[in-house]
Design a protein with these regions (language model features):
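Stable alpha-helical structural segments in soluble proteins, enriched in small hydrophobic residues
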Residues: 36, 83-94, 349-359
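Acidic carboxylate diad motif detector
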Residues: 53-155
Length: 409
């Protein structure tokens, strides 16, 4: 049985003494991160010297023995070591042009600690962390192998979470044999090739007036005052409610898709570029990237085939019946009639059907941009997919290693 790596995130409820202790630990790791980042930046700026986490780890041992820094010894050693390793990974991502330059951490932002090799602390559904004791969780620990690493975090609203990764057996479900194309949009979050339109909940837009009021109230509070801190937490909780509602809706949609369909075709959108253009707030509120991310890992978990169609394929301009392509289609034109076969199309439903057809054709090596067929000779995507899988079975060759996403184009 194949295994997959699954991540877990559980709500934690530390008591008063544990919260005070965690506050000191968060401050220590934040100080270590900022100090190490300042040393590395200054060393490269002045001497062109690139320091590593191992260099700073040796200095950390000396800092613990230096007068005025003995409080570092109160923090679990693994938490401090992992802090330096996280900074190493941040610099690796920067040098590989995946992320921007590491930044200094603020006191009011998200705080986290990482514990390695917790040993007997993982037993009988109870989590016991070094120097902290038993930590109360909102639910019992899953019955999985003891993880190598456990992270404890606190968000801006003051909520605590425990997260870890574990290998679990893949729970593949029997295929339904159904195929679907999914066209993402702002008026409707998702339009299926079956004709169903899923409305866009617009979680952020619906709460925007309340959020603006709370932000204005925060701006009027005096910096450093107790009332400002209370208002800051109120604003953070309001944003957390929006984020949780969005996540719940996306999980419900993606779970339904992977359970009801065996093949899912979506467009490989450049979400980052869309988020910088016109309507950026609405696009970020819709969370196209998060929806695609959930479909990717859930397709690997449960078995459906996820086809990602080339973003440059004009799915809205092709007739899904005869494959005729319009020269021009305005964005405000939601319906159009094919001049060749006379079919009246809903723009989004037609795009979803074309995404499914193009995904299956590209999987079969028959790109629709190079293939033109008449309406009577059009091969349905279900029949074409059956032909592809049958040819793979006869030849012993597979276009994919297993269930999961396949990027096309």
């Amino acid at each position: 049985m194949s295994l997959i790596t699954r991540s877990y995130r559980l709500r934690a409820y530390p008591n008063g003494a544990q919260r005070r202790l965690l506050g000191r630990w968060f401050g220590a790791t934040r100080w270590l991160w900022n100090t190490a980042l300042g040393i590395r930046s200054e060393a490269y700026r002045t001497c062109r010297l690139s320091l590593t986490g191992n260099d700073l780890s040796r200095w950390l041992t000396q800092w613990k023995r230096t007068a005025g820094h003995q409080w570092l010894a109160e923090v679990p050693a693994t938490a401090l070591t992992q802090c330096l390793r996280d900074q190493d990974r941040a610099f690796s991502g920067f040098f590989a042009h995946r992320t921007r330059y590491p930044r200094f951490k603020a006191k009011r932002g998200r705080q986290s600690l990482r514990f390695q090799d917790i040993g007997a602390g993982w037993r009988s559904g109870v989590l016991r962390l070094p120097k902290l004791g038993v930590l109360k969780l909102a639910e019992e620990l899953p019955e999985v192998e003891r993880p190598d690493m456990v992270s404890l975090s606190r968000d801006a609203a003051g909520a605590y979470f425990v997260s870890f990764c574990a290998e679990v057996p893949r729970t593949s479900r029997p295929g339904t044999g159904e195929l679907v194309g999914v066209d993402l949009g702002l008026t409707h979050l998702a339009t299926l090739s079956t004709g169903e339109k899923i409305p866009n909940p617009r979680h952020y837009q619906r709460r925007l007036r309340y959020l603006r009021q709370q932000h204005r109230c925060l701006a009027r509070r005096q910096k450093g005052s107790h009332r400002r801190e209370k208002q800051r937490v109120r604003v953070a909780r309001a944003h957390a409610r929006v984020r949780e509602a969005r996540q719940y809706a996306l999980h419900a949609l993606t779970t339904r898709l992977v359970r009801e369909f065996s093949v899912i075709a979506i467009e490989d959108l450049n979400v980052r570029a869309l988020g910088r253009g016109r309507g950026a707030r609405a696009i970020q509120d819709a969370a196209f990237g998060e929806l695609r991310r959930q479909l990717r890992y859930k397709s690997e978990w449960y078995g459906p085939l996820l086809l990602e169609v080339d973003r440059w394929y004009a799915s809205s301009k092709h007739c899904s019946m005869c494959r005729f392509r319009l020269d021009e289609l305005r964005l405000d034109q939601r319906q159009w009639r094919c001049p060749k076969c006379g079919t009246c199309h809903d723009r989004d439903i037609n795009a979803a059907r074309n995404l499914l057809t193009q995904g299956v054709r590209q999987l079969a090596g028959r790109d629709d941009r190079d293939l033109r067929v008449d309406a009577g000779d059009a091969c349905p995507e279900e029949q074409l997919l059956v032909q592809v899988l049958a040819e793979e079975a006869r030849s012993g060759h597979h276009n994919r290693a297993g269930p999961g996403p396949v990027r096309l184009g």
